[in-house]
Amino acid sequence: MTRVIHTGDTHVGYQQYHSPERRADFRRAFDAVVEDAIDEGVDAVVHAGDLFHDRRPELPDLMAVLSALRRLDDAGIPFLAVVGNHEATRTGEWLDLFEGTGLATRLSEAPVRIGDTAFYGLDWVPESRRDDLAYELEAPDADHAALVSHGLFT
């Protein structure tokens, strides 16, 4: 059985109430997810979007997440993710950068198999475009399948 930690809406970089302490809390919370994944020896960490609070995360936040993803990579734990509404842009997202470095995998309609589970992903889609959404998934070559999305779809 595939064991994962599923998380989302971590909003690294969010300075809630304009408080630097709250900003640090969001970073620590993401670090805790990573440490739990390593301590538990899970097969993957699955993130359902809004890793960052902003479309243009500040360098200290990018570096903190980069360090956390390196720790996962060093432990042999893949980081699978989709893009959320707080970080979606027309020209590219943080996930493209981390995928390019080999530290993350952007989930899509093509399955990513981890153990006995095929993972698929759907980035955030604005509500105005959801009725026209055509999304076809490849049949999984796995015992189980999971679709990770950011947003509510019916």
Q: What annotation goes with each model-predicted range?
A:
Residues 1-66:
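N-terminal active-site segment of His-dependent metallophosphoesterases
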